[in-house]
Amino acid sequence: MSERPVRSILHRRRFGPDLVSARPDETVRDAARRMAEQHCGSILVVEDGRLLGIFTERDLLVRVVAAGLEPTTTKLCEAMTANPETIGAEEPVEEAVRRMDEGSFRHLVVVSGEHVLGVVSTRDIPALTMARMAGELDRRHRLAERVW
């Protein structure tokens, strides 16, 4: 897994012009609706092109619902995770996994210099692992065919 760079697992809806984002003054409800529509577990909070934070399903549950806040009036800036941890696009996927595991979070913002490229989540890792395992099994099968 360590050979592949993080950029290789960015999905279309989580990077570039399709990146799901919101302003800090938007309500939690509006952000949650957009997350549901886009089938994603996080939304980046951005203002004037600057990353301020990330709002995740866990933030919704812990910082809003469990705290008894009203989603229709609570602003994202009140419930987001400010200054989220980031990882460089060329860092190995293994490093992303390590950071998410050690930090007990499920989403990691991918950057190139000061530019946000996207978000990877723990949901992205199993698919990568399965694809690598399938490739390895195929390689071994071809090797076995040559030997026999």
What does each model-found stretch correspond to?
Residues 1-148:
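Tandem CBS (Cystathionine beta-synthase) repeat/Bateman regulatory domains
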